[in-house]
Every structure is written in structure tokens, then in C-alpha cells.
């Protein structure tokens, strides 16, 4: 069965249309589709694979590419898109009819699973390793070729279709760091379903709010997650989430982890993964439009409504493929390791989709930097699997350093293939940066991006010849496509080394979010209204004379805990819901290991007879149940009153400064300035 709209035409070298492409239509599954085509173009053009150059670091290629991306983005990204296989060529590279949203590769059709898996097999690379699964918490190591991944993914796609999932439907994934989580992501992408993968560390309340918001037809989960020293039962967490919430999915697909007891299934609702896969029919890729949502990923925010970032398929595929070579400097076939979690944007972009799109081997690590079993774990993984480049958070490096300051446990390993260490997720302090360089003996490069962008905003683009020894404290230069500027509150451009608002001049490049799920008003209001014509990153920082960006702080109330963005407002809401606390403000307290940890300033209710110690114990437990251990909430200071503005707002920046022993300014809007002195005194006594 070949839908008429799949009668693709081949773009000729002159850019015109050639004859119809015959394509192929394998008789597998209900949704057989034409094999995607590569829209041909000159190799080595701007943004293409041929532009990769691991040069001396003069940055001349970077300058050329960045200038081209700003002055002629259509041509630049059109060339980059030639490295992706398309069922139907796009009619327009860029469209800005509905600003601030930019549509990329308009009317083009593709499938990201085809690009990440099938096409490598068709190009004779089916026996190459796609995934290395390394799980010290279960003492398991396994490798999976592209052929093996395709077999699992295509069958799982068949399972989903059998149970009513079709293009445009939503699927929630709540799984640990196991290959089956990646298979589920790719299977959803294969049939055009929209996945929403939720970090396994979130408690039932957080899971419930996301399920209610995304309304999945199916939830895919596993029997257990494994943490050092304990086992997390996922199914009871899902059950509790469904009790709390309103939405009830049609089916729950449960993967029972090997060598552990099987969890009981609810008749009529629950499906056993192994049983379903044993009788599954493989399903082919379903073409989707470039703008079709690939996934919804929830990010912390200051508003009560969940912020579900929508990722458009086409631009994302183009940007990720381009970034693996141009930013990270990798050749197809090399081993790449992003030491993150699939539940975060790094996991989506650079554990799953990015490396597979580029034909790399990706490491899926179910473990920690320390404690699984010790601070030598990262060195072992790098050595055993021949990793060429690692991406991790500074917190992980700090944890290793804290337990093994001289890196004695790492010295037994030979890191001959290791060439670059990239860090992101939080600001990397200079001390951690220098220690990493000395220990790993490779360039250590900080870079900066956000859930909303899906890939780096600033970086040292080593594939384009950027320096591998940038000044300490910076987070790289503007990535091609991201025209980063520093503005004051009056939208005036600031000079070098002047602290201001970090913004990006529109249009945003391919791969950036296209909206917020069921909340387009917030999309426009939060990101584009304060600085018309720009994307507001809501971060503050400055640029130096060479164009390096220094990200200094977050301008909203999101606390970065060990690279995880946690909303202070969500913690406050949880504390207040306990009933013992009348008022509270949560701010980030600087922490040598985690970067920041939340500290609550609490005002007790007058009718509470319990001691402050008892209340603290209770609210810590309450937050853990509501948000999960990922919040890392353990400390509170009890005060008589909180400072407020006349409109009732808490001056977070001033409180954050007090908590961290820094100077602060009392603005004229504060109702009772004397309360600041009381807060300072209570912090000293704590």
C-alpha cells in the first residue's frame, strides 16, 4: 500500500524536480512505507558532514560557518539537512509566518527512527554496535548491533500499533536506564506516536500531573529501577499516580527485568513485555511532517502549569546529526558516552537520537560516578569501551574528586582512545575544570544549553576548529544558528564583560522547541514577550571580547541540583501542603558537590506544638514523597516572618544572596526591610 502523497520526487543538483522515485514497500506491518531518500547535494557544503574539520584551533572555519548561519540560514541548514534521509523533500527551508515560531523544512517528510537505525543497515553497517549497555548496579554488560536494535524496535512498534497507538497519539515512558527505554522511544518515533519520557526518580505526584497533562493511551514501564543499595518499585508508583490523577490510560506495558521476580498484571489493562514481543509483527516506519512532534519533555518552571517542551522531528534530526560532528568532533563509528539520564534532555538528544543518527556507538550507563562500586567507575567505562568523547555534569566530576582526590582508582586504566571531555548542566567552577584536565589528560570543554533548545546554544565547536583551550569559566561561543546577545532590561546591547540578560536573536535554529504542550500562550509570554524579536533564555551572564559566553545565574527560581533543574516553587508548594508551615521561600544554597541544594526559609504555623526538628523531619519526608529524592531537599531554617514586596512577592534574589553570604540590595518595594536582619540572624544560628 503506497499512499499517493508518498510518490516522492528527487531533487536534482539544480534544485528542480526529477522523476518519481520508485521507493520500496516491504510487506511488514500495517503501515508499510516507502524507504526514505537522501536528497542529494554537494559534499562539504556549509553545515554538511563534509564541513567537519578537526583543525589546529584557529577558529576560521567556525567564523565562516557562524556568519553563514546568521546571514543565510536557509542555505546553511538546507545543506545540513542533505545528510538526513527524507521521504518527501521540503518546499521551503524556513518559514516565519507565525512568529515567534519558525518552521523548518516545510512540507518535508521523514522518519527519525529510519534515520537513526534502518538506513545504517541499508548502508551495510547493520553489524556495527549501536548500543553498549553497562549496568554496574546489576552487574550486566551487553552490546546491541544496529540490526538487533531494529528487530526489537520494529516489533515493539508492532505491539503499540496492535494496541491502538497511531500517528499523533501520546505514550508515557517511565523506565530506568535500560535498552528497553530506548527501544520504546524509537518505536514511538517509528510509528509517529509522541513519547513523553519521565525521569524514573520522580514520585507519584509528579508522574500523575504529567500523565494528566499529556493524556497517554499507553504507559510503558518496568518492574524495577535499581539504585545503589536499593530497588525502586516502579509499578506501585505508576498505580499511585493513576489513583491521584484523572486520566486513565488504556494499557500499561510492563517490562519485567531479568533475574528479578515478575510483578503481577492487572487483567484487561496490563501487558507483559516479553509475551507481547514474542507474538509481535514488525512494523515499518511511518513518514511524518518535519513539524510533527517527536516528543514532549517536561521541564521545571515557575508557573503552576506543567511546561511540556514540544520537539519538532525534522529540525531536531538535522541539528543533532550536524552537532555530533561540528560541535563534538566525532566521526561515525566512534564510541560516545553521555553520562546522563534518558529522562533529561541530554538523554533524549545525546544518549538516544544524536549518536544513532550520526552512526556512532552510544553508551547507556546504569550506574553512578561513585558508589557503583567506587570512584574509578567512569575510568573503567572509558577504557573498556574505547570511548572517544564523554559528556557529563560537573557534579559527577566533583563527586569523583571528593572520594578520590588523586584519582588513584583511575590510574589503572588506559584511556588511549579518549580525546575530549564535555561538561554541561550547570556552571563548571574553574577548580573542577583544572582537576579534570590533570586527571583525564584531555581537553575539558564547558558548554551551555537548555531543555527548550535541545542542543547546545554555546560551545567550543571542535569540529569547526574552535580552540580546545578556551579561557576558564566560559561556556563556549555561539553555536552556528544561535545568534547570542547580551541585553539590558531596556533591550540595549551591552559591551563586553557587562552582566545582562542572555538572549538569542530570532529565528531559532532547527531543533529548538516549537511550543509548550497545550500551553501556547505561556510559550509566547515566557520566552518572547520580554524581549520582542529575541528568545529569552532567562539566564544572566556576559560575553568577553573574543565572543566567549560566561553564564552567571538563573533569573527565575529554578534551582540546579547536580545538573537537575528543580523548581523552587514546586518544593514550596509541597512544604506548604504539609500543613505545619504557614509560609516559606526556597532558594538555592551553594554546595561544593551538587552545585546547589534547596534551602527552605519557613514560618511555622502558630498552632503547631512540634519542635522545629520534628517539623523539619516531616517536611523533608513529605517533599521526598511529592517530588522525589531528586529534589535533594534536607535543610530548612525557621524564621518569624519572610520579607515581601508590597504586592506580596518574595524577593528571591535578595534571599539567595543572604543565604550564600553575598551582598544584597533592599529595593524600595519591600514592605518591612527590618525582616532581612532577622533572617540573617536566624541563618547565623542555624
Swiss-Prot record:
The modification N6-acetyllysine is found at residue 524. GO terms for cellular component: intracellular membrane-bounded organelle; mitochondrial matrix; mitochondrion. It is an enzyme of class 6 (ligase). GO terms for molecular function: acetate-CoA ligase activity; ATP binding; medium-chain fatty acid-CoA ligase activity; propionate-CoA ligase activity. ATP binds at residues 425-427, 446-451, 539, 554, 565. CoA binds at residues 227-230, 624. GO terms for biological process: ketone body biosynthetic process. CDD domains: PrpE. Its main location: mitochondrion. The keyword Mitochondrion applies. This is Acyl-CoA synthetase short-chain family member 3, mitochondrial. It comes from Homo sapiens (Human).
Amino acid at each position: 500500500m503506497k499512499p499517493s502523497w508518498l510518490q516522492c520526487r528527487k531533487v536534482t543538483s539544480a534544485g528542480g524536480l526529477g522523476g518519481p522515485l520508485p521507493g520500496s514497500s516491504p510487506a511488514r506491518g500495517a503501515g508499510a512505507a516507502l524507504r526514505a531518500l537522501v536528497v542529494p547535494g554537494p559534499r562539504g557544503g556549509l553545515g554538511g558532514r563534509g564541513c567537519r574539520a578537526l583543525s589546529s584551533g584557529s577558529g576560521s572555519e567556525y567564523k565562516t560557518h557562524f556568519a553563514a548561519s546568521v546571514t543565510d540560514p536557509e542555505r546553511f541548514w538546507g545543506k545540513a539537512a542533505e545528510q538526513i534521509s527524507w521521504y518527501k523533500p521540503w518546499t521551503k527551508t524556513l518559514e516565519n509566518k507565525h512568529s515567534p515560531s519558525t518552521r523548518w523544512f516545510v512540507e518535508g517528510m521523514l522518519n527519525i527512527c529510519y534515520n537513526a537505525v534502518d538506513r545504517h543497515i541499508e548502508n551495510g553497517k547493520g553489524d556495527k554496535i549501536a548500543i553498549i549497555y553497562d549496568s554496574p548496579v546489576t552487574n550486566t554488560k551487553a552490546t546491541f548491533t544496529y540490526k538487533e536494535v531494529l528487530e526489537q524496535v520494529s516489533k515493539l512498534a508492532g505491539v503499540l500499533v496492535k494496541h491502538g497507538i497511531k500517528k499523533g497519539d501520546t505514550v508515557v515512558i517511565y523506565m530506568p536506564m535500560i535498552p528497553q527505554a530506548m527501544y520504546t522511544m524509537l518505536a514511538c518515533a517509528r510509528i509517529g506516536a509522541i513519547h513523553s519520557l519521565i525521569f524514573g526518580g520522580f514520585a507519584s505526584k509528579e508522574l500523575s500531573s504529567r500523565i494528566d497533562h499529556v493524556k497517554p493511551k499507553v504507559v510503558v514501564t518496568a518492574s524495577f529501577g535499581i539504585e545503589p543499595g536499593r530497588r525502586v518499585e516502579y509499578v506501585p508508583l505508576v498505580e499511585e499516580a493513576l489513583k491521584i490523577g484523572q486520566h486513565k490510560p488504556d494499557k500499561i506495558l510492563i517490562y519485567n527485568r531479568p533475574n528479578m521476580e515478575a510483578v503481577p498484571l492487572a487483567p484487561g489493562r496490563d501487558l507483559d513485555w516479553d509475551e507481547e514481543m514474542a507474538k509481535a509483527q514488525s512494523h515499518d516506519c511511518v513518514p511524518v511532517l518535519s513539524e510533527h512532534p517527536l516528543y514532549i519533555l517536561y521541564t521545571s518552571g515557575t508557573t503552576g502549569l506543567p511546561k511540556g517542551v514540544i520537539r519538532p522531528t525534522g529540525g531536531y534530526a538535522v541539528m543533532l546529526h550536524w552537532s555530533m560532528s561540528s560541535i563534538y568532533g566525532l566521526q561515525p563509528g566512534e564510541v560516545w558516552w553521555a553520562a546522563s539520564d534518558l529522562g533529561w534532555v541530554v538523554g533524549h538528544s545525546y544518549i538516544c537520537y544524536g549518536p544513532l543518527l550520526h552512526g556512532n556507538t552510544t553508551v547507556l550507563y546504569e550506574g553512578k560516578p561513585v558508589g557503583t562500586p567506587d570512584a574509578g567507575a567512569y575510568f573503567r567505562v572509558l577504557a573498556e569501551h574505547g570511548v572517544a568523547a564523554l559528556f557529563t555534569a560537573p557534579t559527577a566530576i566533583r563527586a569523583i574528586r571528593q572520594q578520590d582526590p588523586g584519582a588513584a582508582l583511575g590510574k589503572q586504566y588506559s584511556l588511549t582512545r579518549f580525546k575530549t571531555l564535555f561538561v554541561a548542566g550547570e556552571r563548571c567552577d574553574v577548580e573542577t575544570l583544572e582537576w579534570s584536565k590533570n586527571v583525564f589528560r584531555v581537553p575539558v570543554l564547558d558548554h551551555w544549553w537548555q531543555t527548550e533548545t535541545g542542543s547546545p546554544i554555546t560551545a567550543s565547536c571542535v569540529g569547526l576548529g574552535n580552540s580546545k583551550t578556551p579561557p576558564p569559566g566560559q561556556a563556549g561561543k555561539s553555536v552556528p544558528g544561535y545568534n547570542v546577545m547580551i541585553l539590558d532590561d531596556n533591550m540595549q546591547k551591552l559591551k563586553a564583560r557587562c552582566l545582562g540578560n542572555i538572549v538569542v536573536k530570532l529565528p531559532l535554529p532547527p531543533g529548538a522547541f516549537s511550543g509548550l504542550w497545550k500551553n501556547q500562550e505561556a510559550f509566547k509570554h515566557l520566552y518572547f514577550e520580554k524581549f520582542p524579536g529575541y528568545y529569552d533564555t532567562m539566564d544572566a551572564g556576559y560575553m568577553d571580547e573574543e565572543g566567549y559566553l560566561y553564564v552567571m545565574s538563573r533569573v527565575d527560581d529554578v534551582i540546579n541540583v547536580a545538573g537537575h533543574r528543580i523548581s523552587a516553587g514546586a518544593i514550596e508548594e509541597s512544604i506548604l501542603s504539609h500543613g505545619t508551615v504557614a509560609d516559606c521561600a526556597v532558594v538555592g544554597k551553594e554546595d561544593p558537590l551538587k552545585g546547589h541544594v534547596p534551602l527552605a526559609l519557613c514560618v511555622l504555623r502558630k498552632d503547631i506544638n512540634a519542635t522545629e526538628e520534628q517539623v523539619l523531619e516531616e517536611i523533608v519526608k513529605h517533599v521526598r514523597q511529592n517530588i522525589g529524592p531528586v529534589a535533594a531537599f534536607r535543610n530548612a531554617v525557621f524564621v518569624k516572618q519572610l520579607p515581601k514586596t508590597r504586592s506580596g512577592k518574595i524577593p528571591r534574589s535578595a534571599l539567595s544572596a543572604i543565604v550564600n553570604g553575598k551582598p544584597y540590595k533592599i529595593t524600595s518595594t519591600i514592605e518591612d526591610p527590618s525582616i532581612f536582619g532577622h533572617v540573617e540572624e536566624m541563618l547565623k544560628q542555624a
